[in-house]
Swiss-Prot record:
It comes from Schizosaccharomyces pombe (strain 972 / ATCC 24843) (Fission yeast). Keywords: Membrane, Transmembrane, Transmembrane helix, Transport. The lineage of its organism: Eukaryota, Fungi, Dikarya, Ascomycota, Taphrinomycotina. Pfam families: MFS_1. The keyword Repressor does not apply. The keyword Transmembrane helix applies. The chain crosses the membrane at residues 48-68, 85-105, 112-132, 140-160, 174-194, 202-222, 277-297, 317-337, 358-378, 383-403, 408-428, 455-475. GO terms for cellular component: endoplasmic reticulum; plasma membrane. It is found in: Membrane. This is Uncharacterized transporter C1529.01. Its main location: membrane. PANTHER family: MAJOR FACILITATOR SUPERFAMILY, MAJOR FACILITATOR SUPERFAMILY (MFS) PROFILE DOMAIN-CONTAINING PROTEIN-RELATED. Belongs to the major facilitator superfamily.
């Protein structure tokens, strides 16, 4: 049996004529209240906010150690600068691994279980970081904590695909994708004060307490949303109650032990990474932007403490500018992307296409490079602190606009396998986030903040124009070359 068999074209709403097969288990009607897409808005958004809260934890915990690296290095007698940077970067490296495992497993066991297991792993090993006695223990515990906290980063897009129709996804993606981007800006603001007034251990213990609170909320409130899991469980119950094995879903996987589905599920994102042109293009775009974001964020403390001579607690407040940009970009893009999508859909005789998400990416192409230019040259000439902060806010607006379009494009294209497709993007972007900061300070030392950020701006501008052109003019062709895409252009 082909375990990777595509479902029928109507998988988005599961509208299947059960008269042809009385044993086919599907939604009772297009308005079936058990279908997560038909849940009331309050229940949908409760799920989304919980998953977003989980997704906030990892990036926030990853960046919180930045202002305290000197404290941690002194505690463990770390002299080598690479070993010191590894305390931060090892967390980002595991972000590339975890979603490639958690996302496909959620397409076997469901979203809820994977989210909660990942959170428990994070709670245990993040607490252990505060208790570490050697640098080896710190590296190991940081790696394992990162593995657990990165689980939601691979499941967020899949959850959106489960809950929202294409016309509704813009605002949902706006909230979901804000979390992993807002985390790195919130973390240093909090840890800047921790570094100045208390011990580094409270970096780990504070995030553990917050994570435990979110986990407690999830126990009664977090529901399963994945259609395969919900319908598969319904088929199993019917077979058990009637002592038969005739009931099945459109995927015909109910009679296969779940462990046998694990291997093909784990191979799915790997296949996407190397064989699906549309995934490769979108992942490369996101990697460049995320890598540049982390390059700037990790060199932020140096700019404010060494060039502007601010105390760590005050220097950390400059991250608020990035947070403002992300929040503004999130709200603006959420409105813009849905309105643009509906407008283009009407012009296309009511037929949707993933390419209708491209205009919001194009809008981000202006803000991101412009913000980098402003940030770089105001920092170069030591203008008032508001100058670099305005630049940081601008490029974060552009980052959010671009991300919104790319993530929604992947969700529209891969539908029920949205989690796997976005896990690939998460993997590639996390590798970039690990690698880019390694040369960031050397680049600024050589080129200065002005030309260094100008170079980054030109890279963003070029990659964005290429990506937008390929998606808008050749997206349909690229999707045709990507055999795992579920969206059909005649739908």
């Amino acid at each position: 049996m082909d375990l990777e068999k595509k479902p029928q074209d109507k998988v988005e709403t599961a509208e299947i004529d059960v008269k042809e097969d009385p044993f086919l288990v599907t939604w009772q009607s297009p308005t079936d209240p058990k279908n997560p897409k038909n849940w009331i808005y309050a229940r949908k958004w409760t799920q989304l906010i919980l998953v977003s809260a989980f997704a906030l934890l990892g990036p926030m915990a990853s960046s919180m150690v930045a202002p305290c690296l000197d404290q941690i290095a002194d505690r463990f007698h770390i002299q080598n600068s690479t070993e010191k940077a590894l305390i931060l970067s090892i967390y980002l490296l595991v972000f590339a691994i975890s979603p490639m495992i958690s996302a496909p497993l959620s397409e076997v066991f469901g979203r809820r279980m994977l989210l909660q297991v990942g959170n428990v792993i994070f709670i245990v090993f993040n607490m252990a970081c505060g208790l570490a006695r050697t640098k080896a223990q710190m590296y190991i515990f940081r790696f394992l904590a990162g593995f657990g906290s990165a689980t939601p980063m691979g499941l967020g897009s899949g959850t959106i695909s489960d809950l929202f129709t294409p016309d509704e996804r813009g605002k949902a993606v706006a909230v979901m994708s804000l979390a992993p981007l807002l985390g790195p800006t919130i973390g240093p603001v909090v840890s800047g004060f921790i570094a100045e007034y208390t011990t580094y251990k409270w970096i780990f213990w504070s995030t553990t307490i917050f994570s435990g609170f979110i986990f407690a909320l999830s126990l009664p409130l977090l529901a399963e949303t994945y259609p395969k899991t919900l319908l598969g469980e319904k088929a199993r119950k019917l077979n058990k109650s009637e002592k038969t094995n005739k009931y099945h879903t459109e995927w015909n996987l109910e009679h296969i032990p779940r462990l046998k589905l694990v291997t093909p599920a784990l191979m799915r994102p790997i296949r996407m990474l190397f064989t699906q042109p549309i995934v490769i293009l979108c992942s490369t775009y996101m990697a460049i932007q995320y890598g540049i974001l982390y390059l700037v964020l990790t060199t932020y403390p140096t700019l404010w403490t060494e060039e502007y001579h601010e105390r760590p607690s005050i220097a950390g407040l400059n991250y608020i500018a990035s947070g403002i940009g992300l929040i503004f970009g999130s709200q603006a893009s959420g409105i813009f992307i849905d309105k643009t999508f509906r407008y283009l859909k009407r012009r296309n005789n009511g037929k949707m296409a993933p390419e209708f998400r491209v205009p919001v990416i194009l809008l981000g192409t202006f803000f991101f490079p412009a913000g980098l230019f402003i940030y770089g040259w105001t920092a170069q000439y030591h203008t008032h602190w508001i100058g670099p902060d305005i630049g940081a806010a601008m490029f974060n607006i552009g980052l959010m606009l671009g991300w919104r379009g790319i993530q929604t494009y992947l969700i529209d294209s891969f539908m029920i396998y949205a989690a796997s497709s976005t896990a690939v993007a998460c993997c590639v972007r996390s590798i970039a986030a690990f690698a880019f900061p390694l040369f960031g300070q050397d680049m600024y030392d050589t080129l200065g903040y002005g030309w260094g950020n100008s170079l980054l701006a030109f890279i963003v501008l070029g990659s964005s124009i290429i990506t937008c052109s390929l998606l808008w003019f050749g997206g349909k062709r690229l999707r045709a070359l990507s055999s795992m895409v579920i969206f059909k252009d005649d739908v």
